[in-house]
């Protein structure tokens, strides 16, 4: 069946057949032709949209085993994070390195080496014990940090190029409660930001919202910690869909600067009035999923997310430059989030994601983003990218961080 396949941000479309094998025999047959492996289609970029047949792994959705004593779960690659949480949260377990969307598949998380809100070891690779894939000879291949280690690292962040992931064994965090205490810390300049940077060492979770509408360097540290005392352990799902009429009305407003100003002001105000609050961990991990179809608000024009990595010493210089060039070209970011990443003991990096609404200016956005990347030699997350002209193939398998080289 031919379907119109689109990415999550409605910026890439292709009319192709989607095959959904139910077992290894059917999967092997499909793999003999040129193909692209897809999961839940939640990528912001175009990395899962190929020119050949599309193979969905969503029928490989079984939870194979759960060891509550050791905090270990084995799942098939098509299992969604939401399905895992339904089972693990009532048992006092959680995958604490989780992306902002709970409807992603395990295979998608691993193939993109996703990051979460953790202050330390903020990549899914740190939670993976082992992976089983179907290799180029159509044989099941087991790999881990100890066995087939090189292969293991190629699979993580490899976007299905090494072979489809069949299953994975993941390490879960033990929790006493389904609640997280979130605290907001405001800063109004770069010196304040530096004073608060110590927060990443004393909190389990920490991200930074940056006010991209102001010329000065201001924003919020949003820190979180699990409640230590025993409490309720319930899964929560009060997600809902917006009706078509509301989506249609919002689609005319969402890509305007007025909407962006209002949204960011309300976000800042809500965290200023209530600087400390206790929330359910599902609401903390996945705030955007309260509205299941929120991305359809952007269906009319789409939006892009520019997600890049850099060293902390360059933070102020990069953000100042981006704000300046955005202002000169009448571009703006709906939402800006800064994350912390420990690549190794000697290598610590930050990442910044900017949601940029499209208003018949996609070519301009692409031109400006490429200029920023090349000027500051940034690294990018291809799961979010649809803007870049050229990649350096030497870094293609560097665990989800891809360096850009100048286009000749």
Language model features with spans:
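C-terminal substrate-binding/cap subdomain adjacent to the FAD-binding core in PCMH-type
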Residues: 111, 129-317, 321-324, 328, ...
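Activity-critical C-terminal alpha-helical subdomain
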Residues: 292, 363, 374-408
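Short glycine/threonine-rich loop-to-helix capping motif typified by GTGT followed
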Residues: 219-227, 288, 343-350, 391-396
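Short, hydrophobic beta-strand segments
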Residues: 304-308, 349-356, 389
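Structural signature of FAD isoalloxazine-binding scaffolds in flavoprotein oxidoreductases
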Residues: 45-64, 116-138, 164-171
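Short amphipathic alpha-helices in soluble, non-transmembrane regions
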Residues: 320-325, 365-373
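Glycine-rich N-terminal segment of FAD-binding domains in flavoprotein oxidoreductases
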Residues: 8-103, 112-118, 338, 378-385
